[in-house]
């Protein structure tokens, strides 16, 4: 009888220890580095608190997010207008950079009009 009492007491202590918060796996939220669908490496999600006493931490977290956007070139690394070129800008000779000296491989306007008809 004394052995079974000790066994029950021992099992009760083990079960009470197994239910402590320290032994349970804690969900720490989304963290770590991951890839998005385009294959870009994304950093961990920074928790931004709205408490007044953590305003400085919130500001530094926002600064880090701004730096990530600058590094990744988000939302655009340059304005969309800069990517659109005229035909002349596209075929300017690279070594001169002069708009009036075109590359020899550029088809003449007459040749393109003749091929369309």
Curated annotation (Swiss-Prot):
Give the record's keywords alphabetically: Antibiotic, Antimicrobial, Cleavage on pair of basic residues, Hormone, Neuropeptide, Secreted, Signal
Official protein name in the record = Galanin-like peptide
Q: Which tissues is this chain's protein expressed in?
A: Isoform 2 is found in brain, thymus and skin. Isoform 2 is found in the skin, in pericytes covering microvascular arterioles and venules on their abluminal surfaces. In larger vessels, isoform 2 is expressed in layers of smooth muscle cells. Isoform 2 is not detected in endothelial cells.
One Gene Ontology molecular-function label = hormone activity
Q: Which superkingdom? A: Eukaryota
Q: What is the lineage of its organism?
A: Eukaryota, Metazoa, Chordata, Craniata, Vertebrata
The residue range of the signal peptide is 1-23
Q: GO BP, one example?
A: neuropeptide signaling pathway
Tell me where it mainly resides: secreted
Q: What organism does this protein naturally occur in?
A: Mus musculus
Subcellular location per UniProt equals:
Secreted
The family line of this record is: Belongs to the galanin family.
Q: Which GO terms describe its cellular component?
A: extracellular region
- Propeptide, residue positions: 86-117
